[in-house]
Amino acid sequence: VSVMDKIKDYLHPHMIIILESTTYPGSTRELILPYIKNDNLILGKNICLCFSPERIDPGNKTYNTSNTPKIIGGLTPLCSKTGKKLYSTIINEVIVVDSPETAEMVKLLENTFRAINIGLANEVAIMCEKLGVNAWEVIEAAATKPFGFMKFTPGPGLGGHCIPIDPYYLSWKLNT
């Protein structure tokens, strides 16, 4: 919010503000929108506000900025359309969702799904060790099923700065 305190005086018509940082559902509307409401700025008319989660996987040689679909949710249809037009200049596929809250929730679902499945893979490895079964062989064999199974492997735990904390954003929001 302190960032908005610093930039609010520089906001002017024909700008688009897009929040990409992982956050709880509702934060774009609750924390950013109040700063752009004034006599000169009319949301969806001459200024736009959107949320578009960052979805980059650092070090991934297959998926990069241009070929990873981009999600965007604007506070108005014009905001979404403007955000899509901007991102479409550098990203192959831009998917518009109905609201910033939906876009915010997409990121939390993606990261919570990843956290749970990494934890499950680690638990399976512990169980396999106790049973004298090769966990890697179990996972590789299970991965041959063409549907209903997504391969996750055991390792040192959750990586990155966001995966471990993202489920807590949702928990906090639901308990406020």
Regions found by a protein language model. Give the residues of each.
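Structural/interface elements that position substrates and couple domains in central-metabolism enzymes
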Residues: 1-176
